[in-house]
């Protein structure tokens, strides 16, 4: 519903995409409507309740369609491409939901904290909600990711015990289909540019394969740590103990040990498997939306590859894609302040 409601706005931001931003409209609807409720609640203008969330969503959807009817002229989306994206999204949503079922308990790492924040926000009508550990004080944390999960929970009249895992599997699905869409259009634009110069026939094989590869790289792949430490070193008999999958995020500065120079790299698929619904996890789909907006801006600006770009700061800053990306980067300071 959010995707349909915000489709006119997305179509204005992705005019040269085959689906006119259909898949991105879902994320756009979540981030804009959720932030509107958060902002109104933070100023004490409205309570954080399901009716208020639904009214806010309804007003924004109405504004999107009024804007679309009177201000935007776009071509209809290509249904075949749109359906391909929907099938991929649903397939990976089912896949990640199935995997989440192997360890559904909110136990270990930061799952209890994430679950606790969500339950506190479900009980509360104020923004921020009362801290579950520091009673009498509001949550003092970058809790935007959990807030969006609770926002979707309230507008669907469900409970955290049902939506905790559905939120993380939805993000994992977006982590596949949004890179697929971006890379598909990148590869196709490259192929069209080559055909214009050298001639030949247009093929969809390379764009589709490129999209599947990039989607798999973000949603499923990680790094080469398991290949080296879990397979090769194990086969050579160099590992002293059994392989522990979180080690793949803790080897820079850890192996070999380097004092005062260590880092933790929690790539998306690690977090999806681990089960934390933390800020950096939910923010993955918002970051991909920013990347899509930036590519849409480039694709929309560079209509003639042979023509030299004439940059004007004023023109750049007034482009809708840049304005939307600026808004999202501002949201990141609340949703993932890393």
Question: Which residues does each PLM region occupy?
Answer:
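Membrane-interfacial entry segments at the cytosolic side of transmembrane helices
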Residues: 46-52, 76-83, 199-209, 315-317
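Active-site lumenal/periplasmic loops and adjacent helix-entry segments of GT-C-fold
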Residues: 81-84, 91-289, 294
